[in-house]
Amino acid sequence: MKNILSIQSHVVYGYAGNKSATFPMQLLGVDVWALNTVQFSNHTQYGKWKGIVMPKEQIGEIIQGIDEIGELAKCDAVLSGYIGSAEQVTEIVNAFHTVKSRNPNAIYLCDPVMGHPDKGRIVADGVKEGLIKQAMAHADIITPNLVELRELSGLRVENFEQAIEAVKVILTKGPKKVLVKHLSKVGKQADKFEMFFATEEGIWHISRPLYQFDKEPVGVGDLTAGLFLANLLNGKSDIEAFEHTANAVNDVMEVTANSGVYELQIIAAREFILTPRSQYKAIKIV
């Protein structure tokens, strides 16, 4: 069994961060070591919440604790998502280096949570800069949305062709694999949800239905990053992992849309996370 150290947010109510990613990864047969960067009552898009940002020292202390019982070498991957403070970025990069020193085959997926095309800035001061200047260079895989694609590449990205160029730029900055979680307004079709996956071997595009919500669910990117990493650790090829992830997330979104509720319906859609009913295919475009 593969093991993922998942360092991201936790909400008591609803689905975001580790709450959105842990159960789906476990469904795929991966053990998840969840380390929370924040503990909030609910996600921040409600406009109000209670809770705390974990002290930056706690990340290193917890990693040390796992190491001291001799288990850190069993960690196959580090996944980072929503980060509560700029100082935590450094701690997460250090945590990955510690894991890598115990297991040289361990990989790092950075979900560079900075913002959302329709939700604006959602992270603390300094986090964006830390992700760009520190985390990206150490990540094997990075999973930006459109806002994050622009920030990481330093390009404007106003159309499909510019998105392709931005992905190519990011591949020169450290990551070996780039999964663009949502092309949003720079996609080819306004009524579709479009994604990219890129390596040095090429760029693949996948398109699936775009569901309409009164309020967009939160945690979709967290779910996407977690499923992609779990699929890779389970031995799927890059494209198999990309397709399974896109199809499983599509099914979760469809179940959520049909339910008429705000929060992701991960439990209700659990069978489709394991075996998606959707069969959308990735097409190589470069």
UniProtKB/Swiss-Prot annotation:
Signal peptide: none annotated. ATP binds at D111, E148, K181. Keywords: ATP-binding, Kinase, Magnesium, Nucleotide-binding, Transferase. SUPFAM superfamilies: Ribokinase-like (SSF53613). It catalyses: pyridoxal + ATP = pyridoxal 5'-phosphate + ADP + H(+). The keyword rRNA-binding does not apply. Its cofactor is Mg(2+). Its EC number is 2.7.1.35. Pathway: Cofactor metabolism; pyridoxal 5'-phosphate salvage; pyridoxal 5'-phosphate from pyridoxal: step 1/1. One of its GO terms (cellular component) is cytosol. It holds the Pfam family Phos_pyr_kin. Substrate binds at S9, T44, Q45, D222. One of its GO terms (molecular function) is pyridoxal kinase activity. It comes from the Bacteria. CDD domains: pyridoxal_pyridoxamine_kinase (cd01173). GO terms for biological process: pyridoxal 5'-phosphate salvage. Transmembrane segments: none annotated. Pyridoxal kinase involved in the salvage pathway of pyridoxal 5'-phosphate (PLP). Catalyzes the phosphorylation of pyridoxal to PLP. Homodimer. PANTHER family: PYRIDOXAL KINASE. Belongs to the pyridoxine kinase family. PdxY subfamily. This is Pyridoxal kinase PdxY. It comes from Actinobacillus pleuropneumoniae serotype 5b (strain L20).
